[in-house]
Amino acid sequence: MNVLSGAMRYATPWRTYRRLLSYAREYRWLLVVAACGALLEAVAGSTFLALMKPITNETFIERNREVALWLPLGIVGLFLLRGIAGYITDMAMGRAARSIARDFRVCVLTKYFRLPGSRFDGEPVASMLVRLGSDSEQVAHAVIDAMKVMVQQTLQVIGALVVMLWYSWTVTLAILLVAPLLAWVMQRVAKRYRRISHHIQESNAQLMQAADQALSNYQDVKVYAAQESELERYARLANINLGLAIKVESTRSLSSAAVQLLGAVGLAMLLLIAGHEALAGRLSPGDFVSLMTSMIAVIPALKQLTNVQNMLQSGIASAQRLFSVLDSPDELDTGRRPLGRARGFIEFRGITARYPGRSAPVLDSVSFVAAPGTVTAIVGRSGSGKSSLIKLIPRFYEPESGQILLDGHPLQDYLLADLRRQIALVGQQVMLFDGSIAENIAYGEMRQVVSEEIERVVVDANAQDFVNQLPEGLQFQVGVKGGRLSGGQRQRLAIARAMLKDAPILILDEATAALDNESERLVQDALQRLMPERTTLVIAHRLSTIKHADQVLVMDQGRIIESGTHVDLLARDGLYAYLYSMQFRERPT
């Protein structure tokens, strides 16, 4: 997904870079130290170029023994100074660059946590990972590494030009006639690098997304013998990425060749004009050698300044992608009403909602009441709007019209953090995080609870049997996404987490749909201990699990078309009765 805000889409490269530099402000003293080091490097290099005159005249022409003795020592001292200055520059710049990359990663992840749910529907996780990974690194390169090259090489060029002007301003000014051509080449190269860099970052995200999709679903890929088709898909995207990379290399090579050609033209002009000046007696052999050495030193510096455009423009392209996230509007959080512990009285009043880019509403005029201490089951065919309805309660999405009230007040009146503290969620796909069982139960704001509380909820969630059998018990590492545990075990840990939170509102999103009979029995038993004295909303796939619900809402195409108890709805012989009979292969009587 190409997500660029309108402001950033039209931001000039200089404006973007200037904004990038604001992130370096915190590390300005490191940059000052680095600049001093770069200046010392340039002075040492320029002094060496200036010494070419006495080396030539005094050593080879005048044969001055005294000068021949101290000049080698002076050159060693200059390069020692240059090496120390270079080390200081590299260390200071490197520390600043890595710090800025870290700051960007933290800022962008923090921002993602504040974005509305629609953002996560519209942008693949792979694209987010590219922003947090390579984009942040490219930005550090642009802010610091590119700056280091530009400062170092610019100072080297300036130093060499000062030496050249000192020995012959006429020759130097004549050579500077090629400067406009050089500036034109660098401007064209920068523009092309910037355009290609945008495409490369998007291509990297698509590559990561394709690999993540194939590897995450490796079992389906193998069972359906889809390896070849997935490889073809990945190879096609990799070829696009390769083509873009070749364009970058082509641009770099052509620009380097152009700079070298212009340098050769300048060198030829130097030979021509310097020869004329020497014949007129205005240029000594030492002057000529200093001019020639300085000109030769300028050419690689100019080449590096041209090549740094790739790093700089890639960083600017990455910065625009990062700023498109940082400039996105946060989810609405304007409530001011204090909320300690809610009673849990939920009321939907004429709620209509639709997803961005879709014309048909996902919910259409939905109204119902869920009282504290009751269980409200929500059933219906796939795509009827059950999960969309549930997602409105924690305000992952905002309705288009209507109101949702908690304890008589609109949800928007409460702070988001306070509202979400009232809700515990147990879904079908339980997400555990890489860490211990104890850390996954006492998750988030609950991480300071005592171990006795964790042990209590493990017992209540019917998880003690398998936890006690694990080598480290509660300290057992569950692996990435809880991969070292079974589905039923992960589900019981999710219930333990909800028990520990002790929130007045409980949302169960098909919590037993994917479990075997034994695991379902254990989970259902744990849920029976979790649900009392809470407002419980259950999305149910297996209708046999909601027979004792206080009310059942039957949804179809975003509307509630039936409501009542299990017995009442069976007696009506409507959609609920049909769905129930389909599960048990017979019409109820």
UniProtKB/Swiss-Prot annotation:
Coiled coil: none
Disulfide bonds listed in the record: none
One Gene Ontology CC term in the entry: plasma membrane
Domain ABC transporter, chain residue ranges per copy: 346-582
EC number, as in UniProt: 7.5.2.6
Keyword ATP-binding: yes
Residues reported to bind ATP: 380-387
MF terms in GO: ABC-type oligopeptide transporter activity; ATP binding; ATP hydrolysis activity; ATPase-coupled lipid transmembrane transporter activity
Top class in the EC scheme: translocase
Keywords assigned: ATP-binding, Cell inner membrane, Cell membrane, Lipid transport, Membrane, Nucleotide-binding, Translocase, Transmembrane, Transmembrane helix, Transport
UniProt subcellular location: Cell inner membrane
Pfam families: ABC_membrane (PF00664), ABC_tran (PF00005)
Domain ABC transmembrane type-1: 32-314
Transmembrane annotation, as ranges: 29-49, 68-88, 157-177, 254-274, 283-303
This protein's record includes keyword Cytoplasm: no
InterPro entries: AAA+_ATPase, ABC1_TM_dom, ABC1_TM_sf, ABC_transporter-like_ATP-bd, ABC_transporter-like_CS, ABC_transpr_lipidA, P-loop_NTPase, Type_1_exporter
Chemical reaction(s) catalysed: ATP + H2O + lipid A-core oligosaccharideSide 1 = ADP + phosphate + lipid A-core oligosaccharideSide 2
Subunit composition and interactions: Homodimer.
Family recorded in the similarity comment: Belongs to the ABC transporter superfamily. Lipid exporter (TC 3.A.1.106) family.
Protein name: ATP-dependent lipid A-core flippase
Gene name tied to this protein: msbA
